[in-house]
Amino acid sequence: MTVASQIKGAVHTAVRHDSAGNHVSGRSVFIDDMPELAGTLHAVLVKSPHAHAMIKSIHTTSATSLGGVHAVLTAADIPGTNDVAPIFENEPVLAVDEVQYVGHPVAVVMAETMDIARQAAEQVAVDYEPLAAI
């Protein structure tokens, strides 16, 4: 007798998925299917292209001058603690002075539409001093 044949429960057994029927029938409602609430803003992160670098400056003027952009925030704009780590308090919401991985968020753009937010995020100019990857 093999180990697999001795296993009881969900292994080798069909398990009903609660939302499967709605998914395959097209009845599922996803967030993009719902009407937007009045005043909704869309956020897009500006992320580091570097694995490790010092942030020398962040220029947001071009982004904030686009129509429909409500704000471009950096770590300097966060009141209180800039951290989302659940335990050790070492994960900033937005990078401060240094990025430590490709994709490390350095700014967030908030605009009236996702398209405007994406366009504005591309206009944020971050001056980096690349460092050796950690």
Q: Where on the chain are the PLM-derived regions?
A:
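Flexible, low-hydrophobicity surface segments
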Residues: 1-134
